């Protein structure tokens, strides 16, 4: 009985231990299961984060590839321009779909600076960088491109006189190796159309050949000038004028940069010296180093400044960064300062360094002749002292004659000197009935005549409503048949009371034509003024060609 009870107790104790062991194991197994679940969840979360990081990395890699492609494109275009491929212009910038990513707001994209960052209003219109007017043949591949900005002036425009001077001093070879680009920097379509048509009428050959081009900016190119702040003591109107002027220069440079090797900045109120183009080109080619940035052919303002076309992008970008802040001549000097001046050195050292980039040619090749500035109400009589004396008329040999006039001569500018090609004739305001007469010492036959009034420095001093008249030599001993032929011919021409026959008249300050051989020998030629003139008069060129 006692043994049976002990066996029972032993069995009971064993079962209890087994139960406790199973319970402990079960509890321990349940705890381990919870830990495994935790680790599994963490591994899954880590895997998701790694996947997201991989996707973000791929996204950024694509965006960086876009940036790299844009940089490669810019480098290739610059190299293409260097190699002579000048077909791409800044005017096509808005047409490039690859530019669109830089115009939007992307969170993780590197934003490259473009013209739109400095002129964000251009994004409002796709045509903002396209010329509103473009006349010409689009010539490229030349040595020299000349840019002339022109704006409306209240008193007098010098543009056509400037073009006459520039074109007349070019040789046939130079006309084939250059382009003159006129920027009519106005948004009034009627005004730009009128100026364009006038240029086309006066220079049809140059337009057709590709020598001369006329452009004007889009009305959407300019920003709102009413928000400009005054600076350096300049009133708002002057700040607006100089700000717009900076943008005009940029537009011209952007248009011209792909057309040639060199770009020369000019103004619309200048006169040029003979052989100016070859002189500039040779001076550039003779530079011992390519480090130069500006070659100056005039000491005044922004006249006669030559740049390498490859440098125009840098210059335009710099001007656009500060176009609202300072005038163009200051900005040009700042570009040189940034490139070569050491802030730890003195001003003299800086000037020496800048002199290596900005090289002056003497004597000056261009003279400023305008007196009425493009800034309303401003009179400026700037003259380049290094220009020297310029022969403003072509050389001719006139037949011997006695010259006389009823006009009152101004100072030493006599009619005799003009006839002998020593100077021009300048007189006070003509009145109706005044005359200029050339009486030949011996009667002679004339083949043709040419008179030009006004000159590049005083283009408004012209002859208006003035006729050209000749007096035939009536010799009773002459051949009767020839005499009869001459009398018959004279019936076709208006005759004055004193026997002079009208054979021509002045148009836009010029009178030219051929002399009818039937007149025979002539005693005299006369310029007769028919009406009162509002201005003084200059006779800058006199050419009387004898018949062979």
From Swiss-Prot:
Enzyme Commission number(s) from the entry: 2.4.1.145
Q: What class of enzyme is it?
A: transferase
Which coenzymes or cofactors are required? a divalent metal cation
The protein's annotated catalytic reaction(s) are: an N(4)-{beta-D-GlcNAc-(1->2)-alpha-D-Man-(1->3)-[alpha-D-Man-(1->6)]-beta-D-Man-(1->4)-beta-D-GlcNAc-(1->4)-beta-D-GlcNAc}-L-asparaginyl-[protein] + UDP-N-acetyl-alpha-D-glucosamine = an N(4)-{beta-D-GlcNAc-(1->2)-[beta-D-GlcNAc-(1->4)]-alpha-D-Man-(1->3)-[alpha-D-Man-(1->6)]-beta-D-Man-(1->4)-beta-D-GlcNAc-(1->4)-beta-D-GlcNAc}-L-asparaginyl-[protein] + UDP + H(+); N(4)-{beta-D-GlcNAc-(1->2)-alpha-D-Man-(1->3)-[beta-D-GlcNAc-(1->2)-alpha-D-Man-(1->6)]-beta-D-Man-(1->4)-beta-D-GlcNAc-(1->4)-beta-D-GlcNAc}-L-asparaginyl-[protein] + UDP-N-acetyl-alpha-D-glucosamine = N(4)-{beta-D-GlcNAc-(1->2)-[beta-D-GlcNAc-(1->4)]-alpha-D-Man-(1->3)-[beta-D-GlcNAc-(1->2)-alpha-D-Man-(1->6)]-beta-D-Man-(1->4)-beta-D-GlcNAc-(1->4)-beta-D-GlcNAc}-L-asparaginyl-[protein] + UDP + H(+); an N(4)-{beta-D-GlcNAc-(1->2)-alpha-D-Man-(1->3)-[beta-D-GlcNAc-(1->2)-[beta-D-GlcNAc-(1->6)]-alpha-D-Man-(1->6)]-beta-D-Man-(1->4)-beta-D-GlcNAc-(1->4)-beta-D-GlcNAc}-L-asparaginyl-[protein] + UDP-N-acetyl-alpha-D-glucosamine = an N(4)-{beta-D-GlcNAc-(1->2)-[beta-D-GlcNAc-(1->4)]-alpha-D-Man-(1->3)-[beta-D-GlcNAc-(1->2)-[beta-D-GlcNAc-(1->6)]-alpha-D-Man-(1->6)]-beta-D-Man-(1->4)-beta-D-GlcNAc-(1->4)-beta-D-GlcNAc}-L-asparaginyl-[protein] + UDP + H(+); an N(4)-{beta-D-GlcNAc-(1->2)-alpha-D-Man-(1->3)-[beta-D-GlcNAc-(1->2)-alpha-D-Man-(1->6)]-beta-D-Man-(1->4)-beta-D-GlcNAc-(1->4)-[alpha-L-Fuc-(1->6)]-beta-D-GlcNAc}-L-asparaginyl-[protein] + UDP-N-acetyl-alpha-D-glucosamine = N(4)-{beta-D-GlcNAc-(1->2)-[beta-D-GlcNAc-(1->4)]-alpha-D-Man-(1->3)-[beta-D-GlcNAc-(1->2)-alpha-D-Man-(1->6)]-beta-D-Man-(1->4)-beta-D-GlcNAc-(1->4)-[alpha-L-Fuc-(1->6)]-beta-D-GlcNAc}-asparaginyl-[protein] + UDP + H(+)
Which tissues is it found in, per the record? Widely expressed. Strongly overexpressed in pancreatic cancer.
Report the InterPro entries cross-referenced here. Glyco_transf_54, MGAT4_A/B/C_C
As for PTM, the annotation reads: N-glycosylated.
Q: Name one GO molecular function term.
A: metal ion binding
Localization per record: Golgi apparatus membrane
Q: Give the protein's recorded name.
A: Alpha-1,3-mannosyl-glycoprotein 4-beta-N-acetylglucosaminyltransferase B
Q: Its biological function?
A: Glycosyltransferase that catalyzes the transfer of GlcNAc from UDP-GlcNAc to the GlcNAcbeta1-2Manalpha1-3 arm of the core structure of N-linked glycans through a beta1-4 linkage and participates in the production of tri- and tetra-antennary N-linked sugar chains. Prefers complex-type N-glycans over hybrid-types. Has lower affinities for donors or acceptors than MGAT4A, suggesting that, under physiological conditions, it is not the main contributor in N-glycan biosynthesis.
Where is it mostly found? Golgi
Q: What is the lineage of its organism?
A: Eukaryota, Metazoa, Chordata, Craniata, Vertebrata
Task: Tell me the leader sequence span.
Answer: none
Quaternary structure annotation from Swiss-Prot or TrEMBL: Interacts with SLC35A3.
Is tRNA processing included in the keywords of this UniProt record?
no
Q: Which organism is it from?
A: Homo sapiens (Human)
Q: Which residues cross the membrane?
A: 8-28
